[in-house]
Amino acid sequence: APLGLSLGKKCGRCSTRYCGPECQVQHWQEGGHDQLCKTIKKAGGAEQYNANKKYAEAVTVASEACAEDTKDQTCYICTQALHWKTKEGLVRGCSCRGTAGVVHVSCLVEQAKILVAEGEENNLDYEAMQPRWDRWTQCSLCEQSYHSVVRCALGWACWKTFVGRPEMDPTRQLALCLLGKGLSAGGHYEDALVVQEAELATGRRVGTSENANHMLTVKSNLAKTYQSLDRSEEALSLRQEVYSRTLKLHGKEHGRTLQAASNYVSSLIGLKRFQQAKKLLRKSIPAARRVLGE
């Protein structure tokens, strides 16, 4: 059942919310809450506790997966083989070659946290903040996106960092988005689906317009996850909506519209709806040529 947001039953000690008193009793008696309650409270609540736990697990998975590739090497940030505090191993999940790009997830996280905090302190606008946020997803050396288990660990790290902020805080919403994409990159599509559906529900609950770029991005990411789970009809429906709204919002020659059209065509072709795909391509290809050239 859905968790209560403000009126639901909650634990008097750690404030974990439940859908009702029966759910709370069951969790205490059978779910182990009696053993976890103090730990959850100390962590800062159920969401923070879960984020901390999942992050630690993801870092372990990433460092173990990268152990052979990073053997006898050191972190390019702290210059150590083992992290001085967490004792975690090294990872490399970008496009760096040779010995470049070897690093601790914790070092990447600290770097990203500092950059975002500095940007917020100086009230930087969206355009100036973007390169700082990129540190949660892209290598600063090769400037390519992290992938697989490393991207997944960074997604949990970002969510762990900002989960305590108010639900309407754009930073928290962006962190949730990066968590969903990180889970997808790690192949955890069912988990990504839960996160992205929650992200969409949160946007609607706080009154974000369905035509807002943020909501269109959320729906586009959700459609990609549906596609990964072989839920092609649902992916098609969302991509059709995203394309229609983006076209009205930005016009046919905007980069967002061209990308939305490409995603929509991909779904149509996947479902063998070739005539519809051909019709859309006849509209979008001339626009793409005008914007991007041959």
Language-model regions: role of each:
Residues 7-10, 14-15, 19, 33, ...:
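Cysteine-rich, disulfide-stabilized extracellular repeat modules
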Residues 3-6, 21-49:
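Cys/His-rich, Zn2+-coordinating zinc-finger modules
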Residues 1-10, 18, 66-94, 141-153:
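Small Cys/His zinc-coordinating "RING-like" fingers
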